[in-house]
């Protein structure tokens, strides 16, 4: 049992109990037989402070094992040496931001992806003139502006019908107004946002155009560091912390002229929608949470508070809340967007991605944020350009047969069939052991937050204390065994993508977060639910680095689905923020 959980109990913590916990961790690291034997050895050794032959014998009896005398002698000699080394190792304190030397590479199972990622996919073609045609509204009102896509807002900014200052002020006003119902805001950056908006207006007027995001407000999931602002990671332990660094993705968006207006909520340490201020809500039904952990990002975009936001995903944290809140979200290929300056959770699984209103919006944001960065050794430069169109005659779309087809997924398949897509039945490489591979995530997260766990300061961290406790018993051998199983899963997915180019649905969050494949959640269907009808999403998944195909196909489906005109009414009563 970890110190974190022991200290949460009402029983006093004695020196012998502390010794037992320490020894238990060390015997687990040593790999000394079963967990039962490790516990027994810890109990016996805590009594005298050293490991003896007699104590090993007693521990064998408790564990129901029999060791030879030679095994006992080896255990004593090697155990004492290793425990001394581990004491030295664990005495070194590391900040959560300290990187691991191990680098996850999604291409390792599919060497062809490395070359394929340097050029456009063969089914991509230059877009027709009307593919991203903009039809500005006849009247620009505060009621219509929150729901307009980025490309339309960009036209209004450049034709003098809108200023960035007005757009940013509207976003700030809406964030203030809706937050009591949604609990989606950690910090409003009013002063800096308005200053940046005025600068954007001046630059555009002078002909200095930074691109389509110039003057567009956005929100950051509060695990992105931004110098001079609170970066809380959703955890009470960090609720007043200010970091003096800025995440690479925020720096790139600033260079593109986008205006940061708010830090948005994340579930505590990137889990769920519960943070130290309460539970972030779904604008379509404020009786339920927004899901997470990109809780505030999805909620704020869904409610029309910001045109777009940046979220992150380790095991569903972009896809899940965007599906819950009925907005578009892109989880790019692992390594596509730098995580520099962001809270780490799992070095081998963390990904950043945009949440917005349309597929075109997502493409615009990805174009401004992707690419390698010295602060993230896993980040890479791979080809991406937007907009693109797909030649449907050359594209193979998979329909997953070994997963339940949800109504939104069937709607997407129906739209694809109607436009002549080549649909092929496939089966995902599922195994009962897939979930077990996520022990890698748990072990990495346990190490990132080792000091919190060791100190027992884990109050308000959702299920993390239990996960940290469990991860203490994951040996290095277990971690490496899981990594080998993960590679086999990656190889199976590489083989699958030799038969199709994309697939719809599949209930595959565990699989594709382990393999690093890109996925988009896309609103496609208006579904009757209580308290009001809501927009629901399907998912599309593509080969490594093929976000352009994902977005191009998503845009075709989006144009036929015609659900972007529906918005949540947000009529609930205010909630109490903690």
Name the predicted role of every residue range.
Residues 1-18:
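N-terminal secretory signal peptides
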Residues 16-25, 33-47:
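N-terminal twin-arginine translocation
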Residues 67-315, 414:
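Gly/Ser-rich catalytic/binding loops embedded in alpha/beta enzyme cores
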Residues 129-136, 331-409, 560-578:
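A short helix-breaking turn/cap at a secondary-structure junction
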Residues 131-143, 213-233, 391-400, 436-487, ...:
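Short helix-loop capping/hinge segments that flank enzyme active sites or metal/cofactor-binding pockets
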Residues 160, 215, 255, 259-261, ...:
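Glycine-rich, small-residue loops and helix-cap segments
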Residues 161, 166-169, 198-202, 386-387, ...:
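Acyltransferase
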Residues 245-369, 513-525, 530-539:
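Short glycine/serine-rich loop segments
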